[in-house]
Amino acid sequence: MIVAAALIVSISLWFANRRKAAQREARYQIVLAKYAGDLKPGMNRGQVERYLQTNGAQFRQMCCVANFRGKYVSLKGAGWDDLVKIAEESAPFFCSENNVYIAFEFNPKSQGELSDTNSSDALKSVSIFHELEGCL
């Protein structure tokens, strides 16, 4: 009887957590739709970053978001991508943060420059990006 009650409670908690996760993901999709509607592939980095700054969105840059998704992208000549943080989720015990970003992935326009970014880099895609940070 106790085992059955514990099982019912565990299953109920699992379904509640799944429902909350689905609600969070729906909110992320709304934010993504806004950015993707305003910022189209092919726009240059200068236009994208001006839009973000004008709309008060703080962003940071990170190399090669695609590599974190399991897609291989050569680091040689790779451009940096812009990330706008939209949420924080519970982190597993071995990480200090579990952040959710809108990722703006760019194709670098020019190769071999010293700069990591170029205002003429072309926007390749806009997507949701989850990143565990501060992990052991």
Q: Could you say what each language-model-derived stretch is?
A:
Residues S12-L136:
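Residues within mature, well-folded domains
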